[in-house]
Structure formats: structure tokens, C-alpha cells
Amino acid sequence: MEKIIGLMSRDDWVYTGLLLFSFAASCYVRKLGNNILASGALGFAMALFIIGPRIAYSLGICAIAVGIQAFAPKKKVPFYVFLTTFTYLMFVRFAHYFLPVVEVASHTNVIQLIITLRIIGITFEENDAWLHKNDENATKRYLTRMPTLLEKFAYFYHFCGLFTGPYYTYQMLLDSQNPALQSWDPTPEVTSRFVRLLWSVPAFVITNHYFPLDSLRSDAIWEVSFFTRLVYAALIFVVFKTRVYSAWAIAESICVILGIGIYPAASNPKIIVGPTDLKVFEGLRDKENVEMNSDAIVNLDIPKVEFSDGFRDGMKAWNRSVQTWLALYVHSRVKFMRVETTMLVSAIWHGTYAGYFMSFGVVAMCAILEDVIFKLVPVNPETGLRPQWFRILYTHTIRCRGFEMLATGFLLKNASDVHHFWSSIYYWLPLLCVPFYIYSVKTAAPKLKLVV
């Protein structure tokens, strides 16, 4: 028994228990009619059981956000909520340094992260619906019904995705109440995800056992060759990916069972946006025996994560719900340095560790590096691809080795640990990116101003 327990960390075992319990609960909740308030109460009870009094951290920002939504000027509500929520997130993470409170870490931090996304997301949903309430020919789908106070708190603490993600909108939660979904069979969708577990779980357990992250923190890393260090970083990345592949296979299955993110395939649903062909959706939404899919909740595109040609495609395929959240509520709404601002918000959201900022800061430069290189090696108009020699060379050097290095920074977290390992591989990726980034900034076309 001790050997079995030793295969994973305590946190991993807790997450496994939470996921399995949530999966069983989702089956039961579906049979009872998929009630939102009951699911919110269950999620709150689970959070209270796992983190105890530390649930006060998330309750605090929920109450503050609801107050802002109720009393702030309508047009300014999203800005106030966004700013307040992230300021609060930073405050509670540092509060234990100067107040007699427990640190926001582990499961408490994860709950805080998910609720942060939900608070800001529902605020934008409400505001967009209010701004476009008189649009008769809307080309985009807006919130169909404003939530009550209890429904908001139920959404914030809904057990589905509360501990692992994926993120989903309040409108997606409302859509899951469609009676037509009660007759839809989720078995094929769930089965396809459980097939993934047949290879992702063994791969995680084996690599996690034989290639511990602490090896990168030890001085022994300096005693092996540069090539060996790169290989070890690649194996650490395998541990990280297979852990996430496994967790999200179950997390997505929970969403599927509850009908979250399930739409008619013909309506062309997109991740967290839902159906994009609104005419088709309106015609099929209440019909039974219609082909459905879960594209709106698929959080990973594993083939692209593993085999895409570049950084941008690889990043977009990873944690797609959060990537889309960042695109909708950050990238599309800022006026300058969009990639850099988006990566900064992503780093702040993940935590206060230097490793997050180091990794996400380099990601922004990697995107610029890739743009410059791709311009130098254009796509063949006949094949739609770049030369095969270039794709092989770029993928297996900058792209793959780069992602592996960035993953070590994300996992090691502390500045000293990240520096310890990154210096052993000579900071090769940032040093490669910086000249290209400077070149891109210097040669950026200035915006023309129209003088009247």
C-alpha cells in the first residue's frame, strides 16, 4: 500500500479523489434534473470540506464583486470588477506576510483561480447583454437570462470544474438545462476521454516516479552533459502534460455528463463561445435525436499540443478555455502590447512566483521570434506548408525544446530554482528571443495619425 501511495504526491491523490467524487456526483445530479443551485451548494460543501476556513478568501471576492455589479455605473462595471478581482487576488496571496492568516496555496489557490475567471466572465456576459439588449439582428449570442443573486453564487461554486477547470460561461451553464439534453446519451463522449486515461495515467505514474522535479533543483544537474539536461527537461514536460491530460479527461467528462458545452454539431460550437451558427442553433436546440458534440468544452487539442509547427498553435491548443477567456476579456480589449499584456495577466492569475513571470514573459518574446522566422521562411502557396526541412528543424529545436524549458520555469516556480536550472542550459531561449524581440519593436510600423 505504501508503494502505491508513494507513486503520487499527496496533492495528486487529493485531486484524484476530488475528480472521481465529482464524476460520481455528476451522474447523480444528472438523474435528479441537473439543478444549478444544488450543484453550487455541493461545490461549496466540497470546497469547505477540503480547505475549511480558507474558503473565506473566495467568499470575500464573491461578495465584493456582486456588490460592484449591483451598485457601480453599468458601463464601468467590467473594468471595476476586473481591476478589483485581480487586486484582491494579489492581496490575499501576500496577506500571510503581514497578517496572521493562512497562505493561499494548493487547493485554496486553485479555487481562487477558477472563481476569479467566473466572476469576471459573468460580469462581461451581463454587461454585453445589457449593451446589446436592443439589437434585433445580433450576430453574436448574448446572455439569455440575467442570474439571480443565488444563481450567481451557485455558478461561482458549481462543483463542475471548481478544482481543475475547464472554465465555462454562465450561458453555457444555462444551456445545460435544456430538456432535450436529458435524452442525449453522453456515453460515447465520456468513453473517448476514458480511453485517453489508458495511456496518459500509466505514462504519468511512470515518468513521475523516475523523473522527479527535485532533480532540477539539485547540484547534480551540473554533473551531467548539456544534452542530458535537455532530455531531463523533456521528460519533466512529459510528466506535466500527462498529469494534465489525465485530469482534464475526467474534468471534461463531468461537463459532458451535465450537458455543459453540449450543442448541435451543425451549429459549429466553439470553445466557451458556444454555437456560432445561430440560425441553425435556434432551429435545433429543442429537438431530440440531433447530432451533438462537446467542442465548446474541449480544453485540449492533444495532436496540436504535441505536433503543431509553432509556439502560437501549441499555446492555443493548451488549456483552451482559459486561452479563450484571455482572448475575449484581455487580448481583444487592450489597445497596445496585446500579447505582452495578455501574458502578464496570465502570469498574475497563475500566481506570484517568479517562475510564472519568467516563463510567460519569454512566451511573449517567443511569439515575436516565431513571427520573424516565419516571415523569413514563407509558406509555399501550392502546398500551404513551409519546407519540410524547416518544419523538422524548427519543431525539434526551438519549438519543442522551448516549450520544455518554459515548462520547467512554470513548475520550479521559485526564482532561485528557475535560475539554477535555466543557467545550466545557458538561458538559451531568452537569449535567442531578445534580439528578435528588439528587432521587431524597432521595425514596427508606426501608426499613422489623421490630421484634420
UniProtKB/Swiss-Prot annotation:
Signal peptide: none annotated. It catalyses: a 1-acyl-sn-glycero-3-phospho-(1D-myo-inositol) + an acyl-CoA = a 1,2-diacyl-sn-glycero-3-phospho-(1D-myo-inositol) + CoA; a fatty acyl-[ACP] + a 1-acyl-sn-glycero-3-phosphate = a 1,2-diacyl-sn-glycero-3-phosphate + holo-[ACP]. It is a multi-pass membrane protein. Keywords: Acyltransferase, Glycoprotein, Lipid biosynthesis, Lipid metabolism, Membrane, Phospholipid biosynthesis, Phospholipid metabolism, Transferase, Transmembrane, Transmembrane helix. Glycans are attached at N137, N319, N414. One of its GO terms (biological process) is egg-laying behavior. Pathway: Lipid metabolism; phospholipid metabolism. The keyword Chloroplast does not apply. Pfam families: MBOAT (PF03062). The chain crosses the membrane at residues 4-24, 53-73, 79-99, 104-124, 153-173, 220-240, 244-264, 354-374, 421-441. The keyword Lipid metabolism applies. One of its GO terms (molecular function) is lysophospholipid acyltransferase activity. It is an enzyme of class 2 (transferase). Belongs to the membrane-bound acyltransferase family. Acyltransferase which mediates the conversion of lysophosphatidylinositol (1-acylglycerophosphatidylinositol or LPI) into phosphatidylinositol (1,2-diacyl-sn-glycero-3-phosphoinositol or PI) (LPIAT activity). Prefers arachidonoyl-CoA or eicosapentaenoic acid (EPA) as the acyl donor. Prefers sn-2-LPI rather than sn-1-LPI as the acyl acceptor. Lysophospholipid acyltransferases (LPLATs) catalyze the reacylation step of the phospholipid remodeling pathway also known as the Lands cycle. PANTHER family: LYSOPHOSPHOLIPID ACYLTRANSFERASE 7, PORCUPINE. This is Membrane-bound acylglycerophosphatidylinositol O-acyltransferase mboa-7.
